Structure formats: structure tokens, C-alpha cells
A protein has these predicted regions:
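PLP-dependent class I/II
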Residues: 6-50, 60-93, 106, 110, ...
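Short, surface-exposed loop/turn segments at secondary-structure junctions
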Residues: 98-103
Length: 395
């Protein structure tokens, strides 16, 4: 029997484990401390978004939060639904081992089923709980998915401008990040540019709709043309190695009248990554999911690969408490009204002052053209007025 099987129950096993390590103590040789230079560089060069956000926290502490206008980090400005607090209160009555104990790695079965059933109600699908893998938010969903569908040396296409962490996660998976520019006038995905970016090394394409940072919502026509283009590319490849479409959807619920197409119904080789950070205003709680649709021809191999990636990356399980919250709040509507009012107020004022922009159809960002060539200099000067914005070259 493994020493660790009943470690919490048997002091004899603990003693045995401690004794068994003595022989190894003399095997260590003192040498120079080594660090991973890539990780050092990533940590030393913190995200410009996080850097501006941290600066904002300092200024708020110095002059008061009401005097700082922080448009940096994507923190929802609306509170979580009241049902979230009610669910937490209910969960706190559970026995400690149920409330705080580990869940199965893919998530609580009842939570996975709740997600699948919610998707079925909304999109007319036939998913099951086993098609859902609960994660520590969208970042974990993306990193697990990337590591599941790629091999070192592969290429992953992103639609520029894009969330800057995509490159970090792609490169950590040993892959090359390849940019395909969006249409400059509408920020719709450019199928022609994606086609130009495809090579025999392409393993996946990441799309983000509603888009961060532009607010564009990709139309059904755009996505259908993309799907057809990917199928044409797949026809020249090993049928067991199609190009995967990774649909990153943390902003799906935050739209202003636009329709967000359900991508797996358009392209069969799709994996969906989702987070409740925006829809339920829970960014600090880190809970989301990966959907491997049962309509994906590679599903039988993809889900074990996702589980293996989560294990390898050190994601033990999604937060137990908030999996229970998701069960209770799965169909709670997002409060889009406040974002819609902000969008109207900002766009009206910016237009009055001579700024140009593409009006966002979703998410809660505004991509504005500065009135000068250097966006970094513009954002730096804006700090004098306690206005914090992120320069576009960060994306």
C-alpha cells in the first residue's frame, strides 16, 4: 500500500515516510541556483494592462477611488446577481468536507450536467455532462485546450488585435503564435487573412467573439466562410489531424442586440472555452469550463487530452464552492443595461470631441483611435488627468 494512500489516517505511515527520506538527504549537491529565463522574463515584463491597473490601485489609495478613471483591466463594473450571494449562503450550511473538499478533476457531476443542460436549452443541442470539463476560469480553459490540441512546433493562429496572453499561452505550449489581421474597418474576422496564415504546421485557430479588445461580434456569415475555408484546408491534411477552432467566449452574454452564433453548430472541429468572470461578475473566483462537443469527430480523444493537460499544468479541480454556485445560477441573466449606458455615453462624448471608433456590438471595451500617432504617449499624458487607458500596441 502506498505511504500516501492513508497518510491523513496513519501516524505510522507518516513516520515511515519521514524515515524513508533520510537516505536522499545526502544525495543533494549544492550548486548554483538556476531559474527558467523565459519565466523570469515573463515575470519581469508584466502585462501592460496589469501594470496600469496596479498604478491605478496606488493612485486610488492616494487620492480616492472616485478621483481615478480606470479603463485598464476588464473588471466588471456591475455587481454579481443577488442569486450568487444566496447560493453561497446556502452552500455554507453544507458539511465542511462537501463544501471545501476536492471535487472530481473534471468537476462535480451535477455542475457539468447543469452546464450541458443549459447549453441544450439555449442552442438546441444534445450535450451531456461528460462533454464538459470545469476549470479555474477562461485562462485555464485556454491553456488546457492549447496543450491538448497542439504539439511543440505547431502553429496557432490568432485574430489581431487580440488578448495579449494568447501569445504567452501559445508559446508556453511550445508553439508559434501566427497573427491574422482583422478587417481594419469593422474588426470582423478576415477569412482571407486567416487563409494566408494557414500552413501545414497550423494546429488551431483561436477566435474571441464578442471580441476583446474591439467589441466586434463575428457574424454567422463570417463564421460560415471561416468554417468552409478550414474544411478546404483540412481536405489537404490527415483526416485525424484537422485544424481545431478554439472559441473563447467569456463575453458571450454581454451584447447590445447582436446575435452571437453558436460556433460548434457551424464548424464541427470546435472546442468552446468559457468563464463566469464577466457574465456573473465573478472574475476573482476563477470558474469556467471547456466544452468538447459530442459532435466533434475527435471528441473521444479530445476529452482525455484536456484532462491530461489539466493534470500536467497543475489544475487539480475548479473551486468546489463556486461549482455549487454555478449550479444554482446557471441561467442568471447578465446585467447588460449598465454597460449599454456607458457605451452610449462614451461614444457620444468621443464623437463630439472628434475621436473615431468602431461601435462595439459586445463585451465592454471601446477601441478608439488616438488623435496622434503614438498611443503610448497619449495614454501616458492621460495619466495627468487620472485617466487610465491601454495603448493599442499591447494587443
Amino acid at each position: 500500500m502506498s505511504v500516501f494512500t492513508h497518510l491523513s489516517l496513519s501516524p505510522i505511515n507518516i513516520a515511515a515516510a519521514l524515515c524513508s527520506t533520510k537516505a536522499y538527504n545526502t544525495a543533494y549537491v549544492k550548486g548554483e541556483q538556476m531559474i527558467n529565463e523565459t519565466m523570469y522574463a515573463r515575470g519581469a515584463e508584466s502585462s501592460i494592462i496589469r501594470e496600469i491597473f496596479s498604478y491605478g490601485l496606488e493612485r486610488k489609495a492616494q487620492i480616492g477611488a472616485e478621483n481615478v478613471f480606470d479603463f485598464s483591466l476588464g473588471n466588471p463594473s456591475v455587481p454579481a446577481p443577488a442569486a450568487v450571494a444566496e447560493s453561497i449562503k446556502k452552500a455554507l450550511e453544507l458539511p465542511s468536507d462537501q463544501l471545501h473538499g476536492y471535487t472530481p478533476a473534471p468537476g462535480l457531476p451535477q455542475c457539468r450536467t447543469a452546464v450541458a443542460e443549459s447549453l441544450n436549452r439555449r442552442f438546441g443541442t444534445s450535450y451531456e455532462g461528460k462533454d464538459v470539463f470545469m476549470t479555474v476560469g477562461a485562462a485555464a480553459s485556454l491553456t488546457c485546450t492549447l496543450n491538448a490540441v497542439t504539439n511543440p512546433g505547431d502553429e496557432v493562429i490568432v485574430i489581431a488585435p487580440y488578448f495579449p496572453e494568447y501569445r504567452v499561452w501559445i508559446e508556453k505550449a511550445g508553439c508559434t503564435c501566427v497573427e491574422a489581421l482583422a478587417d481594419e474597418d469593422t474588426f470582423q474576422l478576415s477569412v482571407d487573412n486567416v487563409l494566408k496564415a494557414i500552413s501545414d504546421k497550423t494546429a488551431a485557430v483561436i477566435i474571441d467573439s464578442p471580441n476583446n479588445p474591439t467589441g466586434a461580434v463575428y457574424t454567422c456569415d463570417t463564421l460560415t466562410r471561416l468554417a468552409n475555408a478550414l474544411r478546404e484546408a483540412n481536405a489537404q491534411r490527415d483526416p485525424e489531424n484537422p485544424i481545431m477552432l478554439i472559441s473563447d467566449e467569456p463575453y458571450r452574454e454581454i451584447v447590445y442586440g447582436a446575435e452571437v452564433p453558436w460556433v460548434p453548430s457551424i464548424y464541427e472541429h470546435t472546442i468552446v472555452c468559457y468563464s463566469y468572470s464577466k457574465s456573473l461578475s465573478l472574475p476573482g473566483e476563477r470558474v469556467g469550463w471547456i466544452l468538447v462537443p459530442n459532435t466533434n469527430p475527435q471528441a473521444a480523444r479530445l476529452m482525455p487530452a484536456v484532462a491530461g493537460a489539466a493534470r500536467t499544468l497543475g489544475f487539480v479541480c475548479a473551486p468546489a464552492l463556486f461549482q455549487r454556485v454555478i449550479i444554482d445560477c446557471i441561467d442568471e441573466p447578465s446585467d447588460v443595461e449598465a454597460y449599454a449606458r456607458n457605451r452610449t455615453a462614451l461614444t457620444n462624448a468621443l464623437a463630439e470631441y472628434g475621436y473615431t471608433y468602431v461601435e462595439p456590438d459586445g463585451a465592454f471595451y471601446l477601441w478608439v483611435k488616438a488623435l496622434e500617432p503614438d498611443a503610448n504617449a497619449f495614454c501616458e499624458r492621460a495619466k495627468k488627468y487620472e485617466l487610465l487607458a491601454v495603448p493599442s500596441d499591447s494587443f
